[in-house]
């Protein structure tokens, strides 16, 4: 079709007038340009000096009007050219939706989303805008609901809506806490699951505001908000250049080092329990961001066991616990009356089973972070009107996992022994 002569002064003047009008009239703080790889009179090759000169000229004019304005490019050029434009001060979209979707669906062999990290592309500046969803890509939760890993449907079925939304949390924890700007597509924070192709790719989609009243979706909204607030309120940590990542395997981790606060993000993307070594920056007390539980680290290379889809964000500064809607499992535990205390504990833990008196028996066990079973027993029906006392006086200080299973339901809790 027809195209502008990008080298024409008239074309450049027109572009500058339009950009300046939007900046001054509407006080916008950024402009995203579609397919800037086409801003040239040459072919859409991966490396084009004419295009580079034209884009720099346009950006300079924009910054002469507002030096702080975000210039965002949907470019899709060679990495060398994108790096050059990034070094100049422009931000570029980084499409990692395929790998994020594979990770959320539980297909770990294709779940490496390292390309969402600007360092992984050899860039100097954190100007890579990574994202989970966009207007051009399929919805994460549609794929999770439709194609998620269901190879163990009776144990852990990714296609179950509760499991799928938890895995959306897992992916979000990494996406939003990897240093660099992010793009959040509309309703992603509520697990929008209407396909991009329903009824057609560019057809209007329903605005499902009622998702706000669905607790399991409201929880994802709360988690997303809490993640963004965490990085905003602790920008020194989450903008640090001193960070490391391991995103290629079934368990993934992100390590952020900073003089004010260190942080570790760990997650299990498999459909089985897995051990992960967070590689804590130092010994001492670390805190789980969402639960506010403390973890005493006596070995920097200690291993933690994560359930399928589980993630944790540890900081070495105690933060205010965010307000998050309870998950289905947490609500179930609360409704069924399972409670234990004290936590942290020293010599014993008291477990309250009083609301479980309608079942025959339950299997109970406590494991350490290596997965070794330390206590295992069967709790019979007559015990359910009591508070059971568990002796933990012989346990070394650290984090342990308590599991209660009955009639297909499993309740997991973390216990800290001091």
List the model feature ranges, each with a label:
Residues 1-12, 36-50, 151-164, 210-214:
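The substrate-binding groove and active-site-proximal loops of carbohydrate-active enzymes
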Residues 4-31:
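An active-site-proximal structural segment forming one wall of the substrate-binding cleft
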Residues 29, 35-137, 173-177, 188-263, ...:
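Active-site-proximal helices and loops of the catalytic beta/alpha 8
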Residues 142-161, 201-207:
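A solvent-exposed, charged loop/short amphipathic helix patch at secondary-structure junctions
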Residues 290-293, 318, 370, 408:
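Solvent-exposed strand-loop boundary residues in beta-sheet-rich modules
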Residues 319-327:
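Short, compositionally biased serine/threonine- and acidic-rich segments at solvent-exposed termini, linkers
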Residues 331-341, 345-418:
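C-terminal outer-membrane/trafficking sorting elements
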């Amino acid at each position: 079709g027809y195209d502008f002569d990008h080298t024409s002064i008239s074309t450049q003047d027109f572009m500058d007038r339009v950009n300046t009008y939007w900046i001054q009239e509407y006080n916008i703080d950024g402009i995203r340009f579609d397919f800037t790889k086409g801003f040239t009179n040459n072919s859409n090759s991966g490396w084009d000096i004419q295009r580079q000169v034209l884009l720099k000229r346009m950006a300079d004019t924009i910054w002469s009007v507002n030096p702080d304005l975000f210039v965002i490019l949907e470019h899709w050029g060679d990495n060398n050219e994108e790096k050059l434009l990034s070094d100049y001060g422009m931000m570029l979209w980084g499409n990692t939706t395929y790998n994020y979707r594979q990770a959320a669906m539980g297909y770990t062999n294709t779940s490496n989303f390292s390309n969402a990290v600007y360092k992984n592309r050899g860039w100097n500046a954190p100007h890579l805008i990574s994202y989970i969803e966009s207007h051009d890509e399929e919805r994460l939760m549609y794929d999770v609901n439709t194609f998620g890993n269901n190879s163990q449907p009776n144990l852990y079925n990714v296609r179950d809506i509760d499991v799928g939304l938890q895995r959306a949390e897992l992916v979000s924890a990494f996406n939003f806490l990897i240093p660099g700007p992010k793009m959040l597509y509309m309703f992603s924070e509520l697990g929008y699951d209407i396909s991009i192709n329903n009824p057609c790719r560019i057809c209007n989609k329903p605005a499902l505001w009622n998702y706000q009243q669905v607790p399991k979706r409201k929880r994802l909204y709360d988690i997303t908000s809490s993640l963004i607030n965490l990085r905003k309120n602790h920008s020194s940590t989450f903008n640090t250049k001193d960070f490391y990542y391991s995103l290629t395997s079934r368990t993934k981790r992100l390590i952020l080092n900073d003089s004010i606060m260190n942080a570790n993000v760990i997650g299990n993307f498999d459909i089985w329990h897995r051990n992960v070594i967070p590689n804590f920056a130092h010994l001492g007390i670390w805190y789980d961001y969402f639960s506010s539980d403390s973890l005493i680290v006596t070995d920097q290379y200690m291993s933690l066991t994560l359930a399928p889809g589980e993630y944790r964000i540890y900081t070495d500064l105690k933060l205010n616990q965010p307000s998050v809607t309870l998950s289905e499992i947490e609500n179930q535990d609360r409704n069924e009356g399972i409670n234990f205390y004290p936590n942290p504990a020293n010599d014993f833990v008291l477990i309250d089973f009083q609301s479980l008196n309608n079942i025959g028996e339950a299997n109970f066990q406590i494991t350490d972070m290596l997965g070794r079973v330390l206590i295992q027993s069967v709790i019979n029906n007559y015990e359910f009107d009591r508070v059971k006392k568990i002796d933990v006086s012989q346990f070394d200080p650290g984090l342990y996992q308590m599991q209660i299973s009955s009639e297909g339901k499993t309740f997991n809790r973390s216990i800290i022994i001091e």
